[in-house]
Amino acid sequence: MRKKVMIKAGTVLLLAVLFCGLIVHPGVKANTVEDYGIISVYGEAVITAAPDIARVVMAVETRHESAKTAAEENARLTDAVIDALVQAGFDKKQVKTSGYRLSSYEQQVDPQNREKYMTIYRAYNELTVTVHDLDTVGNVVDIALKAGANRILSIRFELKDEEALKLQALQNATAQAKAKAVAIAQSAGVTIKGIKVIHEEMSGYSPYRVSLDQSESAKMMEQAPTPIIPGDVEVTARVKAEYFF
């Protein structure tokens, strides 16, 4: 009986020692990330890539003293542009209306009589043509202008799927951030222990744009074929990271 009591007492003592070992002494503080120094850095990356799709934005604009006539003439010319593109082999699904408006303004009739005005109605139909074969972008411009479009607003060269390049740019930006942190730490004579936080500042891409004004549209009508040479698009990413040492 006495032996059993001694065994139980020993067990209790052992558990007490183990329990005390789990308790942090009030005077001893466990290390946390906040106890370390912080190095904050930004990482940036730019990837260039050849575009694989283009969007040609054009417009048909008509004006007349009658709103009905302006709208009807605009519809006729717009249909002619779409039909010409389809006859040239483009799918009708590649042509979308991206804007339409019918507005009016006052125009002076007689320069000698400043009080005499007439109302002019302006119909404006904007079309966006998606082009998959970049070699035919110039053909789209020529066909549209000859069929009735009187403005080429812009030509954008884009990517069908930019997500893979965005991820690659983020990886490159993260690698640059780490390299910066290591360089700073080495210069300061400290060693990086780990990363506290990292987050994406931005990622995206910029299409290659060819912007044209009305005078340039007129020049295109005088020359054929229209040479359109695409440029590379840029995919960019930026991250912010904090490392502790």
Across the structure, where does each feature detected by a protein language model lie?
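Short, charge-dense linear interaction motifs
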Residues: R2-F245
